[in-house]
């Protein structure tokens, strides 16, 4: 089955996560393991809709695209993926998500303007100015799980 594209409607849940994860250009052969760790953590979420945007066309981007496709095909009831959401749909979607998860600059730049939590995974956005709504973590299962728990805790 093909991935649902931008014409399909997002079925929002009580909890919603937007995932945008790109390979890190200067890190060779790390994208697959890092993204598998993210998928492991996302799989632990209950009653949560996961909205993926496809990665850019960096060297290991096709690996991540395949992992997303496989995940969505196995988890149709709780996930959807977009090759491109377009600016309007992307910004409109931010209104309904609890967090942006991944390593995209939009989590650092746009999300804080909307007062949306960002889980920034790894070093892709290293040394960028960040708002108070950004949680940084290593691309490791336990750290990602801890960051996701923090998003839904009353402390954050």
Report the location of each language-model feature.
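Nucleotide-activated sugar donor-binding and catalytic core shared by glycosyltransferases
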Residues: 1-156
């Amino acid at each position: 089955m093909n991935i649902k594209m931008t014409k399909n409607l997002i079925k929002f849940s009580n909890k919603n996560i937007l995932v945008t994860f790109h390979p890190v250009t200067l890190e060779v052969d790390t994208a697959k393991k890092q993204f598998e760790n993210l998928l492991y953590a996302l799989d632990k979420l209950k009653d949560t809709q996961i909205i993926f945007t496809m990665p850019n066309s960096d060297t290991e981007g096709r690996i991540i695209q395949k992992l997303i496709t496989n995940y969505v095909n196995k988890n149709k009831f709780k996930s959807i993926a977009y090759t491109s959401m377009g600016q309007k749909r992307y910004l409109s979607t931010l209104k309904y998500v609890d967090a942006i998860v991944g390593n995209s600059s939009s989590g650092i730049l746009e999300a804080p303007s909307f007062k949306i939590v960002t889980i920034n995974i790894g070093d892709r956005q290293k040394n960028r100015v960040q708002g108070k709504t950004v949680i940084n973590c290593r691309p490791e299962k336990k750290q990602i799980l801890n960051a996701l728990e923090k998003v839904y805790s009353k402390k954050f």
